[in-house]
Amino acid sequence: MKKGIALILAMVLLLAAPAMCVAQAEQQKHIVFVTPLIAHPVWLIAKEGFDAAAADLGFRGSWVGPSTIDANEMIKQIEVAIAEKADGIITQGINPEAMVPVLKKAEEAGIPLVVVNSDIPEGPRLAYLGTNPTNLGAIGAEAILSKLDGAEPKVAYMCAVLDYQIGREMIEGYRSVLSQEEGYEELTIVESKSDMLTAVQAWENLFTTYPECNVAISVAAEAGPACAKVVNEMGLKDKVVIMAIDDIEETIDNIKDGTTYATMTQNFFRKGYEAAQWLVEYIDTGVAPAELLNDSGTMVVTLDNIEVYSEDMKKPEKW
């Protein structure tokens, strides 16, 4: 009799298991990260943070977005997330004005949204998490002046695209400090289009057109390695001070070999992890982050601190 009861109970549990799994899947939160560059090295660092948060906090994460910067495609992906009734959305303000309406749609659907890296000031969002771009530029400019040691700065800038808000603000931060120096000259601003080959060709043309250039500032991750490649090929290593952005592998290698002077780091891991953490906490408790605008921090990385700078960047308890 006891064996029969045990057998029946085992069969009931076996039959119930699929339903329990379905119920758990239905209860699992779904958070969508709409990135501006789905496979770009620096955004893959954000994905690493996002995936780590998913593992730690138990939500299902979707990583979506265009392969090249395209605000319209990002808007479409946000609309898809809204239609799928995602529990939360993370995105970046590539074209803030154009993205306001879709943020309002998310709000109307009851979906909390966190903006990272560059804000959408007029749009409804739970919070913003990103580098203060003008502060980053100003800090970078001070480091460049230290390296120039009195030489007059003849500066060229490279951004991803000219209408990319965060890039413009970073350049303005550099300009606000460098323009105070005697002999400062802003030679040009060129685009990388978020493409390494395009960046290389642009730097080649730039150094040919402006042989007086002694400072090359990148506010797009691929632009720094592209500049280092061209400087080496054109024999300009000892003439041009290269300031890169982000700590992708090529840039770190170029600092180690002395081609690139420094890079301005942004904590993209934190942007992926903490943005998701805020959404989960808000969904569970209704409590929003204490501040609407949050600085994810920045640091100048040179040969002096290259071996130690990243120790705390992936530790939430250190943020």
Show which residues each predicted segment covers.
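Short, low-complexity disordered leader/linker segments with a strong preference
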Residues: M1-H30, A55, I82, K104-I111, ...
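Extracytoplasmic "Venus flytrap"
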Residues: H30-G49, A53-L57, G61-V80, E84, ...
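Short, solvent-exposed amphipathic alpha-helices that sit
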Residues: V42-L57, L136-A143, Q165-Y184, A202, ...
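Short beta-strand elements in bilobed, periplasmic/extracellular small-molecule ligand-binding domains
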Residues: A55-S67, K154-Y157, L178-M196
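Hydrophobic alpha-helical segments within soluble ligand-binding/sensing domains
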Residues: M74, L129-V155, G167-R168, M196-V200, ...
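Hydrophobic alpha-helical
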Residues: E79-E108, Y174, S192-D253
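Flexible loop/hinge segments that line or gate small-molecule binding clefts
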Residues: P96-N135, I139, K154, A160, ...
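Hinge/cleft segment of the Venus flytrap/periplasmic-binding protein
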Residues: M158, L162, I166, V177, ...
